[in-house]
């Protein structure tokens, strides 16, 4: 199993190109199922989760051509509506094929998903909403069997809790439903807006983008289009955090500063100089040790839970102390024991972590537990004294494209070992 060997103590400097967002690419790939003519998706990141979903969609009989950063799909060859456990088990996002398959073909059989071990993340919100649209759903032997007679019917749906995947699944189902569907308490993440914009390019009628109420007027069919995946705001924030923790200066390009304001505000509070351009962000820590800053994770546009672990890592070597409150996912402090092994001073009390900054971290063998937590260990290793070995880095490969090449280009001493 691959590991990262990182030698700390290098101030990162340079420029890094940001990839397309994994969290946008996955629903956009699922939405290709809805197109009745060829469709092209550009700026697709080369990641394990993306490859898995492309494989899953190809397994439905759809012709998939994946080359470089471009995926082309032709749904005219579809032969079945079955998403098997072997592919679904590694990734939660595979449940996103449920809505499009059901809406377009009236039938879907999808295994219950796997993916990161963060909290319960139940799919019951997806299923309840699909039933409201007229679907008949049975869950047996670990599979969701969904059918509908004729077309799905528009409905007024209110999610019990904010669910990104649920919003995406129902949005994709509603675009081909008969009549109007109103989705209330919808998630407002930029990746959902990206999905809605591609669906509109395909001929869908959607109002209320960037709000918590989406109104969808169903159409009979959607056509293909050419579309580009939005920049990855979490990858952007992660590389800026690498500059902050090492006292360096990093410019991220091919990104969108407007999607990351809550995080950039925190970097500025830490003492960094942040410069924004139209499609770039530069963070200069000017060799200083960052100031520890408190924050609370909340749904977009507030501070994203997917940046919690990275900002905690920066706080670990910060001046002073900070309280970090995680309100989105339970069980999302799994990186704390690993950071503590490197000398971090962190106390966890329920959904709060109290971080008292230390001047130095020591290298230690550590283990990645989930996607974002694993990047926090990379950040800590970049400033630790000595050589840190990070195990289970397959978690990192699920969400960061060419991570070692990108970090090496900034001066980091990182290599992949087995």
From Swiss-Prot:
Organism: Acinetobacter baylyi (strain ATCC 33305 / BD413 / ADP1)
Major site of localization recorded for this protein: cytoplasm
Keywords assigned: Cell cycle, Cell division, Cell shape, Cell wall biogenesis/degradation, Cytoplasm, Peptidoglycan synthesis, Pyruvate, Transferase
Catalytic-site annotation from UniProt: 116 (proton donor)
Modified residues (2-(S-cysteinyl)pyruvic acid O-phosphothioketal): 116
Physiological role: Cell wall formation. Adds enolpyruvyl to UDP-N-acetylglucosamine.
A Gene Ontology term for the protein's cellular component: cytoplasm
Keyword Transferase listed: yes
Binding site for phosphoenolpyruvate: 22-23
GO molecular function, one term: UDP-N-acetylglucosamine 1-carboxyvinyltransferase activity
Gene of this entry: murA
Protein name: UDP-N-acetylglucosamine 1-carboxyvinyltransferase
Membership in a protein family: Belongs to the EPSP synthase family. MurA subfamily.
Cellular localisation: Cytoplasm
GO terms (BP aspect): cell division; cell wall organization; peptidoglycan biosynthetic process; regulation of cell shape; UDP-N-acetylgalactosamine biosynthetic process
Enzyme Commission number, as recorded: 2.5.1.7
SUPFAM superfamilies: EPT/RTPC-like
Keyword Nuclease: no
Binding residues for UDP-N-acetyl-alpha-D-glucosamine: 92, 121-125, 306, 328
NCBIfam families registered for this protein in UniProt: murA (TIGR01072), PRK09369.1 (NF006873)
């Amino acid at each position: 199993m691959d590991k990262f060997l990182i030698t700390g103590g290098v101030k990162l400097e340079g420029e890094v190109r940001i990839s397309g967002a994994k969290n946008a690419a996955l629903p956009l790939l699922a939405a290709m199922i809805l197109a009745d003519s060829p469709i092209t998706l550009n700026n697709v990141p080369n990641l394990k989760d993306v490859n898995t979903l492309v494989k899953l969609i190809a397994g439905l009989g759809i012709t998939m051509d994946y080359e470089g950063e471009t995926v082309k799909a032709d749904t005219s060859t579809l032969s079945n509506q079955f998403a098997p456990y072997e592919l679904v088990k590694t990734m939660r996002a595979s449940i996103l094929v449920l809505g499009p398959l059901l809406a377009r073909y009236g039938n879907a059989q999808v295994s219950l998903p796997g993916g990161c071990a963060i909290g319960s993340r139940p799919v019951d919100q997806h299923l309840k909403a699909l039933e409201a649209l007229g679907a008949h759903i049975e869950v047996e032997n670990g599979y969701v069997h969904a059918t509908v007679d004729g077309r799905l019917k528009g409905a007024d749906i209110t999610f019990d809790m904010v669910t990104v995947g649920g919003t995406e699944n129902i949005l994709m189902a509603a675009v081909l439903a008969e009549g109007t569907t109103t989705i209330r308490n919808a998630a407002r993440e930029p990746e959902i807006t990206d999905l809605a914009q591609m669906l509109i390019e395909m001929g869908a009628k959607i109002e209320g983008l960037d709000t918590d109420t989406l109104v969808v007027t169903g159409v009979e069919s959607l056509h293909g289009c050419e579309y580009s995946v939005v920049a990855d705001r979490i990858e952007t924030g992660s590389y800026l955090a690498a500059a902050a923790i090492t006292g360096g200066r990093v410019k991220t390009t091919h990104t969108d500063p407007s999607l990351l304001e809550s995080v950039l505000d925190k970097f500025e509070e830490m003492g960094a100089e942040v410069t924004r351009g139209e499609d770039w962000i530069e963070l200069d820590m000017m060799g200083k040790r960052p100031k520890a800053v408190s924050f609370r994770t909340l749904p977009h546009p507030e501070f994203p839970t997917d940046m919690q672990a990275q900002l905690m890592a920066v706080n670990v070597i910060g001046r002073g102390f900070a309280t970090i409150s995680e309100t989105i996912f339970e069980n999302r402090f799994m990186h704390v024991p690993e950071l503590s092994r490197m000398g971090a001073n962190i106390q966890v009390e329920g959904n709060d972590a109290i971080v008292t900054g230390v001047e130095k971290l020591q290298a230690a063998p550590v283990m990645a537990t989930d996607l974002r937590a694993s990047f926090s260990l990379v950040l800590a290793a970049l400033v630790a004294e000595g050589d840190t070995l990070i195990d289970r880095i397959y978690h990192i490969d699920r969400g960061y494209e060419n991570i070692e090449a990108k970090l090496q280009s900034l001066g980091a001493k990182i290599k992949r070992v087995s």
